[in-house]
A protein has these predicted regions:
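Metallo-beta-lactamase
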Residues: 27-30, 44, 67-68, 75-77, 126-169, 173-174, ...
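Conserved beta-strand hairpin/beta-sheet module of binuclear metal-dependent hydrolase folds
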Residues: 40-86, 179-181, 186-189
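Divalent metal-coordination and catalytic microenvironments
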Residues: 48, 62, 72, 86, ...
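Active-site metal-binding motif and surrounding structural segment of the metallo-beta-lactamase
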Residues: 42, 65-69, 77-121
Length: 311
């Protein structure tokens, strides 16, 4: 059964999703009105690589002579605005789409893009979860489903770069991928990295685990250098120093919770210790300290996927 945290997160996502709005019998006009004021802002990062900010997860973009690749697609009512931002960069319409994971603020535009012939790619579990849905998320329509899936990863040789897509197991969910432009030295981390806007959300009901979040941060840190541009799932652009600080936060909170669990302390007692207090500084954050500590606590009660994380 989904945890209260995951249900809350899903409810917030669905509050803005077209599927939920349809389920509530709201009109298409009302759906669009929710996003009428959203602007898609593009920031070039390297030759043929950009990030798009709007509502929902940050979007990565590769464009050039071999076609346009979108990394995540936010919400369905924003598809035309996203395509407009792509056009304004001088790029062709989207040809390929990679989903970093299955959540609706990263896959909400899948159906629109799929219906235009865009080739959708994602990790195996993303397709599985989109097909099944859950208590808060209806099953996705066929056009929204990835048609190319992978277990460990895939490489795209496009637009003068090698784009390496790698699965990070049991982290934010069980289907997270990072996308690394080798030549451009840009990496999109999806929701493996929330940069300065909230404490991390770990979707336990979708196979996520705090240990995997830490392992993913360590893996990416081993790949990057001081010049790497890092696209987080949410928040502003980041660099290696930002990711180090994020990794250290994860390590500190996980370590404190694990130590307290070993001493027999309950969840409430550990929350009262406020092990995430120094990072719980945004009053508007989606995930606050107690919710994050709860997710870490429950993660540590689950089997350790250390061997998976090492691969």
């Amino acid at each position: 059964m989904p945890s209260p945290i995951s249900r809350t997160f899903a409810a917030l996502l669905l509050a803005a999703s077209p599927l939920a709005l349809s389920a509530c019998s709201e009109s298409n006009a009302q759906e669009s009105d929710r996003f009428a004021e959203v602007e898609i802002r593009a920031e070039p990062l390297a030759d043929g690589v950009a990030v798009l900010f709007g509502a929902g997860g940050n979007i990565g973009l590769s464009y050039g002579p071999d076609g346009t690749v979108l990394i995540d697609d936010q919400f369905a009512p924003l598809t035309d605005k996203i395509q407009g931002a792509v056009k304004d960069l001088g790029a062709e319409p989207v040809k390929y789409l990679i989903n970093t994971h299955w959540h609706g603020d990263h896959t909400g535009g899948n159906e629109n893009l799929g219906q235009t012939g865009v080739l959708i790619m994602a990790q195996d579990h993303v397709r599985d979860r989109l097909i099944k849905g859950n208590d808060s998320t209806p099953p996705a329509p066929p056009a929204a489903l990835p048609v190319v899936t992978y277990h460990d990863g895939i490489k795209l040789h496009l637009n003068g770069d090698e784009i390496r897509v790698q699965h990070m197991k049991h982290a934010h969910t069980d289907g997270d991928s990072i996308v690394f432009w080798q030549k451009a030295n840009v990496v999109h981390m999806g929701d493996l990295f929330f940069n300065k806007v909230t404490l991390p959300f770990i979707d336990l009901s979708s196979g996520g685990n705090a240990r995997g979040m830490l392992a993913a941060a360590d893996k990416v840190l081993a790949m990057v250098d001081d010049d790497t541009r890092i696209i987080p799932g949410h928040g502003p652009m980041a660099n290696k120093a930002d990711l180090i600080a994020y990794r250290d936060m994860l390590k500190s909170v996980i370590g404190a919770v694990e130590k307290a669990q070993g001493e027999g302390k309950s969840l409430a007692q550990i929350q009262a210790m406020k092990p995430a207090a120094q990072w719980d500084v945004n009053p508007d954050a989606f995930i606050k300290g107690d919710a994050f500590v709860e997710a870490v606590y429950k993660s540590l009660q689950k089997p350790d996927h250390a061997e998976d994380h090492a691969h």
